[in-house]
Amino acid sequence: MKSVYEIYAEFLLGRVRFHLREETDVFHASLASFIDAKYVASASLSAALYERIFTTRLICESANPPGFVPSQDNLAVQLQNLRDREDEVINRNRLGFRAITKQLAEAGVLTSAEKQEYDTFYTDVRNPVAHGLTSRLYERFSGRVPDHPFEVDSAYESVYRSVAHTLIDKIYFLMGVRGFRKE
């Protein structure tokens, strides 16, 4: 796992690229929060971004019909296709994370092993962060059950430091190393 400072340097050099400027800004805010020792904020931003990356990739991957050739002449059609697909995925079908990764696997973007890995990470890390389940994170990142109810609260900062670093590293791998962004 790379240090957050190394990942930040890679990001500043333009080696970590996202589909949307909003995603880029969220990752930057997550990195800045981590560096400012605001680990809960960093983890929360990264957890939301982790899910968003897959949603955006599915929308970009499947917005245009088979055989459609994007060009300068059909930009308005491309934009409408993206809007329609986003509405379908988010509002009409309300696809959850596993349904999104399933469609990405069916499209050949993910292997079944990658789908399983990302789904497991979502369950083990993203969900507890999003729902404030610090005790579950404590057990996972400390490797043990707390001895008393106050132990989790007294150690939350170190837990969230580890969680935020893990999420940032996972996002860095997806967008910087693996190149999950659709070109």
Locate each region found by the language model.
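Charged alpha-helical initiation segments
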Residues: M1-V40, P65
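Short, hydrophobic, well-ordered secondary-structure elements
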Residues: F27-L31, I35-I59
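"Short basic amphipathic alpha-helical interaction patches in structured regions
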Residues: L45-S46, N64, S142
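Generic structural signal for hydrophobic core residues of well-folded globular domains
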Residues: S46, I53, R57, E61, ...
